[in-house]
Amino acid sequence: GSIAFKGDTLSKITPNIIAQMGISRTFQNLALFKRMSAIDNILVGRKLHSKANFMDVALQLPKARKEEKVNLKKCEEIVEFLEIEKIKDTPVGKLPYGLQKRVELGRALATEASLLLLDEPMAGMNVEEKREMCRFILEVNEEYGTTMVLIEHDMGVVMDISDRVVVLDYGKIIGDGPPEEVRANQNVIDAYLGVSHGE
């Protein structure tokens, strides 16, 4: 199959161009710089908006300093939004898993994407961490107006926070619609209750 965004097929487009199109993502397995602080990891997401070149930055020219101020201010707002002010200067490798996932969400938000792809954002989290991540996902949508596509196996979470649910079984769509409709779909029930594919 193929994936299209605003009429453009993405299969042959490089990741940097996809980011420029307004798509950002988080990963199932964390992809953070463990020795860098939380705020520095979030700042990485601002790279897309940087216009200063290497020499501007190296010589600390006014253009680079101004850009750095703007980027830092934006990241500080994200830190506050995600309620991670107390750990913003901590190397992410020293943070609990749930906070690392929040930092990764912050980095994705820093890109100012119109579409966020969240690959199993709740994987490995305890109940409280899941509850908090759900709250942040809903608030991102509300505050920033960002559309999110979530790949998640916790069906309770999916049903609670989604406007639309698409369920795949071995690559085939078996359910598509509002959560209430998908929850009652017999094909979805069979797939998640383990009915054999031979039946």
What residue spans do the PLM features occupy?
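Glycine-rich phosphate-binding loops of nucleotide-dependent enzymes
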Residues: G1-E199
